[in-house]
Structure formats: C-alpha cells, structure tokens
C-alpha cells in the first residue's frame, strides 16, 4: 500500500502539471494577442 504522503505527493504533481498546461495555453493566447 502507498503511504498517505506518497499519494498526496502524486496528487500535487498531477495537479501542478495540469495547471502548468492550462497556464501555458493562457500564456500562448495572451502572447498571440499582443504579438499580432
């Protein structure tokens, strides 16, 4: 069985990677808006 701390760490990493993807999408949209 996983220790609770390991599960928490995996959850945080998963959420962070999703947030990074969403942030990258927003950043690219904003960059396109200002560059063009």
UniProtKB/Swiss-Prot annotation:
Location in or out of the cell: Secreted
Keyword Secreted: yes
Tissue specificity note: Expressed by the venom secretory cell of the spine. The spine is a cuticular structure containing a single large nucleated venom-secreting cell at its base. It is an independent unit capable of producing, storing and injecting venom. On the back of D.vulnerans caterpillars, spines are grouped together by 50 to 100 to form scoli, of which there are eight in D.vulnerans.
Single annotated GO MF: toxin activity
Range of residues in the leader sequence: 1-19
Keyword terms: Secreted, Signal, Toxin
CC annotations in GO: extracellular region
Coiled coil start-end: none
Biological role stated in the UniProt entry: Peptide with insecticidal and antiparasitic activities. Induces irreversible paralysis in D.melanogaster when tested at high doses. It shows a moderate antiparasitic activity against the major pathogenic nematode of ruminants (H.contortus, EC(50)=41.3 uM). Does not show antimicrobial activities. Does not induce increase in intracellular calcium in mouse DRG neurons, suggesting that it does not induce pain.
Family: Belongs to the limacoditoxin-7 family.
Name this polypeptide is given: U-limacoditoxin(7)-Dv63
